[in-house]
């Protein structure tokens, strides 16, 4: 090859390469739970949604529960992205979400009764999202009951069985419901037969279900689009996009405390696969960290406090699951856990929520290390629940501030010890804290920088 030909080929490569790297005029910012869920992601998304064009859900189903307080009204969302409270924002339910249509329409009706309007013009559902059927929920409950004393603490919303159907390639997607209904009927009968064979005690009235889903098809049709094309077009046109992760990093099926996890990837990888986005579209990755730690259901919890401290956190923090209504288990903030989820997710900044719940404490403990029973320090987060359940926790003791922070709106006006608590977390994680929450509403989020 001549020198001139090589130069032409080199320039051609550079032009194409630059075109690929600069094809998107905007980025996708992501909000992820950094612990076991219930960190306050919905409130953070609600705050940021006022400045973006599109808010997306990428995984999970109505096993998630997000509470948003807007204009004095409290909204509970399970399938809908929290951004729906912003009337200027388009909300997207991506291909990675599994959708129980009866629950979706119940949620739409309940929130419309609270004042949400014109959702048909600003909610888009992926045609590739899989459906959760009632028999999935029945199977979920049966599988949990079979485990007896070793139950996983599932929400029994059918999420795991629906993802199982997806993985075994006999699941049904939203787009198939809207296509030839005879083909949908055949697939539905087939998936029911499979589940009845595996679980003989479940009873499905196939004709009644098909009649119901024929009605749902027309109800959901106006909302359904190819969300992959929609999002890529939006990015090329410079539209700003925010992704609301459901559940949290420690519930991720790969990186969480398996098997006490959910059935989807609720870390950064699930954002890409659940929306059809390439890695170069990702901008800020915001980790939402509760100022202490909670989890719902079973599974190891190194910093859990089964004492008056745990009771105080549970009571002051109103720690009851939005979806399950179960009391949340409570404990101290866990730095090794947060370092691990930061490693997996690559947080570019952090939002600390519910700092005000610690207002009454004279002393606050923070987990700073794990060690084995023989005294050996761990330099990694345990990969098995057996190991995690047997470790000993090393704590740092920080002084409390014992004064209310609830009405403070400027970081420098927080008590010095409260500021020190935030800076301690920032220093330990080497990730900047951008916001601190001291109350329920979006107005209670303090911009640190």
Curated annotation (Swiss-Prot):
Assigned keywords, A-Z: Cytoplasm, GTP-binding, Ligase, Magnesium, Metal-binding, Nucleotide-binding, Purine biosynthesis
Residue positions binding Mg(2+): 38, 65
Keyword GTP-binding: yes
Catalytic reaction annotation: IMP + L-aspartate + GTP = N(6)-(1,2-dicarboxyethyl)-AMP + GDP + phosphate + 2 H(+)
Gene3D superfamilies on file: Adenylosuccinate Synthetase, subunit A, domain 1 (3.40.440.10), Adenylosuccinate Synthetase, subunit A, domain 2 (1.10.300.10), Adenylosuccinate Synthetase, subunit A, domain 3 (3.90.170.10)
Cofactor binding: number and manner: Binds 1 Mg(2+) ion per subunit.
Main localization, broad class: cytoplasm
Pfam families: Adenylsucc_synt
Sites where the protein binds GTP: 37-43, 65-67, 328, 354-356, 437-439
GO molecular function: adenylosuccinate synthase activity; GTP binding; magnesium ion binding
Compartment(s) where it occurs, according to its Swiss-Prot or TrEMBL record: Cytoplasm
Subunit (UniProt): Homodimer.
Entry similarity comment: Belongs to the adenylosuccinate synthetase family.
Protein name listed in UniProt: Adenylosuccinate synthetase
Taxonomic placement: Eukaryota, Metazoa, Ecdysozoa, Arthropoda, Hexapoda
